[in-house]
Amino acid sequence: MIFDIHSHVLQKVDDGAKNLEEAIFIVKDLISQGVKKVLLTPHNIPQKYTSSTEELKSQFELLKEEINKQNLDISIYLGQEIYYTKLTLKKLEEKELLSLNNTNYVLIEFSYYNEPNIEEILYEFKLKNYKIILAHIERYRYLQDIQKIIHLKLSFRTFNSSKFFYNMR
């Protein structure tokens, strides 16, 4: 069973599906590739993609209804891909941002160029019982050293075609 944990299928909320019809087209394509479960992770990037949790949940329910109506064999779950700022943890605590399917896992994206103090951020999240999954690890020049990733105990999500994935084989 394939479980896609990072997708931009949810309609009208970021640079992913533009409407419900396009979202269903993407869902059908995922099914054709053997995906049985998909975590919808629309972007939250300040000043760019800032849909409220209410809007995300509303669009999620519309998509879920259409999937059920068309009797498509896939389960969907809701979360967000969150661009890290100093307010991220506070917003998670206040439910202004979404963890992955209401768990303590959070899909985080950092600046690709300016290295944050990842150890400190991981510690702060750990104190609040959150676990970070790093989106797009292949894009971070400062994390190309596998030993650094192991030291930080980072979980990550990457594309199969990424250079990093091939280097790990």
Regions found by a protein language model. Name each.
Residues M1-D73, H151-L152:
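An N-terminally biased module of ancient metal coordination in phosphate/nucleic-acid-related enzymes
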Residues I5-Q11, V38-H43, L107-E109, I132-A135, ...:
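Short beta-strands and strand-loop turn motifs
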Residues T50-S161:
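Extended substrate/RNA-proximal surfaces in nucleic-acid metabolism proteins
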